[in-house]
C-alpha cells in the first residue's frame, strides 16, 4: 500500500492531493496492476482505450505510424507516464500508438467509473485531469499554426517535433527519402 501511495504521488493526476485523500482513493478504487517483460506490448495502436493506464516503473518504446503506414516514429519514455490520457474519452477512444516494454515494466489501470468517481469526489484531481487534457489539446493546436521552415534541416526537425510526444530524447524515424 505504501509503495502505491509513493508511486501515485509522482503522477501528475494525483499531485496536490493530501495524504488522507490518497489513502481514501487507494482504499476505494479498483486498481488493475500489470507486469510486463521485455518486448511485451502494453497497449497497441487501434486498441480501445477504456482504462487510464499509468506506467509506474520501467521504460517503454512507443511507435506511431502514419495513417497509410508509410513511415513511423519511435520514441522512448520513462516512468512515471500516463499513457494517452487524451484518448480515454471522446469521439475516438482508441490508442494511436503502440507502447512496448523495453525491460521489466509495471502499470496500473483505473477504469472509467472509478476515474469519474475520483474526479467527482476530489476537486484537485478534477483540475489536474482538465489541466493535462487541456495542455495536450493546446499543444496540438499550436503545432498546426507554426510556419514551415525554409531550409531542409529545419524542415526535418519541424517534422519530428510535430509528430513526437516529447521534443527531447532518442527518436527513430523510418521513412523513405522520396517520402521525406
Model-derived features with residue positions:
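Cyclic nucleotide-binding regulatory module and flanking cytosolic helices
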Residues: 1-38, 77, 82-83, 87-91
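Short, Lys/Arg-enriched N-terminal segment that forms or immediately precedes the first helix
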Residues: 8-9, 137-148
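Amphipathic, well-packed alpha-helical segments that form the structural scaffold of globular domains
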Residues: 26, 134, 138, 157-165
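Glycine- and acidic-residue-biased ligand/ion/polar-headgroup-sensing regions
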Residues: 39, 50-63, 79-80
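Short phosphate-coordinating micro-motif centered on Lys-Gly-acidic
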Residues: 41-47
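N-terminal positioning helix adjacent to the helix-turn-helix/winged-helix DNA-binding module
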Residues: 148, 152-159
Amino acid at each position: 500500500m505504501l509503495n502505491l501511495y509513493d508511486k501515485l504521488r509522482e503522477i501528475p493526476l494525483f499531485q496536490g492531493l493530501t495524504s488522507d485523500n490518497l489513502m481514501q482513493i487507494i482504499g476505494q478504487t479498483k486498481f488493475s496492476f500489470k507486469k510486463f517483460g521485455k518486448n511485451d506490448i502494453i497497449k497497441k495502436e487501434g486498441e480501445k482505450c477504456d482504462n487510464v493506464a499509468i506506467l509506474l516503473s520501467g521504460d517503454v518504446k512507443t511507435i506511431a505510424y502514419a495513417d497509410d503506414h508509410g513511415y513511423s516514429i519511435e520514441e522512448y519514455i520513462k516512468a512515471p507516464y500516463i499513457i494517452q490520457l487524451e484518448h480515454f474519452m471522446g469521439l475516438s477512444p482508441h490508442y494511436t500508438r503502440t507502447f512496448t516494454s523495453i525491460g521489466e515494466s509495471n502499470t496500473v489501470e483505473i477504469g472509467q467509473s472509478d476515474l469519474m468517481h475520483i474526479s467527482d469526489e476530489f476537486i484537485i484531481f478534477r483540475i489536474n485531469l482538465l489541466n493535462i487534457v487541456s495542455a495536450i489539446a493546446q499543444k496540438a493546436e499550436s503545432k498546426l499554426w507554426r510556419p514551415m521552415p525554409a531550409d531542409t534541416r529545419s524542415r526535418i526537425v519541424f517534422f519530428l517535433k510535430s509528430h513526437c510526444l516529447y521534443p527531447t530524447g532518442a527518436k527513430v524515424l523510418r521513412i523513405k527519402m522520396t517520402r521525406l
